C-alpha cells in the first residue's frame, strides 16, 4: 500500500510572547498557530522488511537528525509494528524559516504511518510521541488553529476569521538556538489570555518577542522589513524567522500584493519570476481552518 502526495502544511505564529524560562532552560511561550496552504508533500510506501528508507535528500541534514526519520522510528518503537516504509519528501516550505516545515513533516509522518500501518493510535497518543521531536510538532497533530502555552504542549483550539497571507523569505538563515540564547531576548513578557487575543484582529495583537533580536543580528531581515514597509507592507516575523508575513482579508488581495512586490523587483532589475537575491520566496497563501489530515486520526 502507498500513500501519495500527503500534505504537510506550514504554520504561522500570529504572535509570539516569551513569558518565562524553566529551570531546565526551556523557554515558556504564548503564541497562536495558524496553518497555511503552503505545504510540503510526502509519499509513503509500506515495506514488509521493517526498514525505514529515505528516498530524498535534505542538504545539511543527516539521516539521524531528520525529523521525518525520527518520527517514523518513534512510531515503530511505540507500537511494536514490524512494518517499515520507504518515504519520499518534496520540500516547498523554506528550511529554517520559522514556518515549521520540519515539524510539519514529522507530524504528517506520524499521522500517515499510523494510517498506513494500521497502528490505531489516538490523537493524544500521537501528540505524546510528537513533543519529544520538537516543540512545534504537537500542534500539527492537534490539527486546528491553536492558542499555545508552555513549551508547546498546552494547546487550545481557537476559531479564526478567514484570512490570507503574503509570506516573504529574506536571504538569511536564522538558527533558532542562537536567538533563544541571546542575552537581550525579552523573557518576561506579561501573560495574556485567549480572550485578550480574540478581542482584537489577529494582525493587531501582540508582537513577536524574537523579532528584535533577529533584526539586530541579521541585516538581511531588517533590510527586508524596511523595504517591504517602504512598499506599503507591515510585516511580522513567524517563529524565530527569517520568514515574514503580512495578513490580508482575502487571497486576491494577498496575490495582488505579491504581484506588486515582484513587479517592483523586476523593474529594479533584481528578479525574474517570484524570487530575487534578496528574497528567496514571495508567496501568497490562504489561511486554513484546520490541518488537511485532521480527519485521519481518531480523537
From Swiss-Prot:
Thylakoid recorded as keyword: no
List of residues binding ATP: 94-104
Catalytic residues (UniProt): 11, 136
EC number: 2.7.1.148
Swiss-Prot/TrEMBL catalytic activity: 4-CDP-2-C-methyl-D-erythritol + ATP = 4-CDP-2-C-methyl-D-erythritol 2-phosphate + ADP + H(+)
Keyword presence, Disulfide bond: no
Family: Belongs to the GHMP kinase family. IspE subfamily.
Function in brief: Catalyzes the phosphorylation of the position 2 hydroxy group of 4-diphosphocytidyl-2C-methyl-D-erythritol.
Entry protein name: 4-diphosphocytidyl-2-C-methyl-D-erythritol kinase
Name of the gene: ispE
Amino acid at each position: 500500500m502507498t500513500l501519495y502526495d500527503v500534505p504537510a502544511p506550514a504554520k504561522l505564529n500570529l504572535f509570539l510572547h516569551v513569558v518565562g524560562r524553566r529551570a531546565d532552560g526551556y523557554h515558556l511561550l504564548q503564541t497562536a498557530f495558524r496553518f497555511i496552504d503552503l505545504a510540503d508533500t510526502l509519499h509513503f510506501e509500506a515495506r514488509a522488511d521493517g526498514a525505514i528508507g529515505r528516498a530524498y535528500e535534505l542538504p545539511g541534514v543527516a539521516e539521524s537528525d531528520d525529523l521525518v526519520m525520527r518520527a517514523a522510528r518513534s512510531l515503530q518503537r511505540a507500537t511494536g509494528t514490524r512494518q517499515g516504509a520507504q518515504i519520499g519528501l518534496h520540500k516547498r516550505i523554506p528550511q529554517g524559516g520559522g514556518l515549521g516545515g520540519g515539524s510539519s513533516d514529522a507530524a504528517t509522518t506520524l499521522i500517515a504511518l499510523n494510517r498506513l500501518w494500521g497502528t490505531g493510535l489516538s490523537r493524544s497518543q500521537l501528540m505524546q510521541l510528537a513533543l519529544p521531536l520538537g516543540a512545534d510538532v504537537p500542534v500539527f497533530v492537534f490539527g486546528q488553529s491553536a492558542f499555545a502555552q508552555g513549551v508547546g504542549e498546552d494547546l487550545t483550539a481557537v476559531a479564526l476569521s478567514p484570512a490570507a497571507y503574503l509570506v516573504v523569505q529574506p536571504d538569511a538563515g536564522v538558527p533558532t538556538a542562537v536567538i533563544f540564547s541571546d542575552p537581550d531576548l525579552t523573557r518576561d513578557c506579561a501573560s495574556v489570555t485567549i480572550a485578550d487575543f480574540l478581542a482584537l484582529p489577529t494582525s493587531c495583537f501582540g508582537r513577536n518577542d524574537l523579532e528584535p533580536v533577529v533584526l539586530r543580528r541579521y541585516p538581511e531581515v531588517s533590510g527586508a522589513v524596511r523595504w517591504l514597509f517602504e512598499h506599503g507592507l507591515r510585516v511580522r516575523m513567524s517563529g524565530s524567522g527569517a520568514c515574514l508575513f503580512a495578513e490580508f482579508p482575502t487571497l486576491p488581495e494577498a496575490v495582488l500584493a505579491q504581484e506588486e512586490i515582484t513587479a517592483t523587483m523586476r523593474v529594479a532589475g533584481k528578479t525574474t519570476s517570484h524570487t530575487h537575491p534578496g528574497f528567496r520566496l514571495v508567496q501568497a497563501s490562504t489561511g486554513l481552518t484546520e490541518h488537511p489530515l485532521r480527519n485521519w486520526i481518531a480523537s
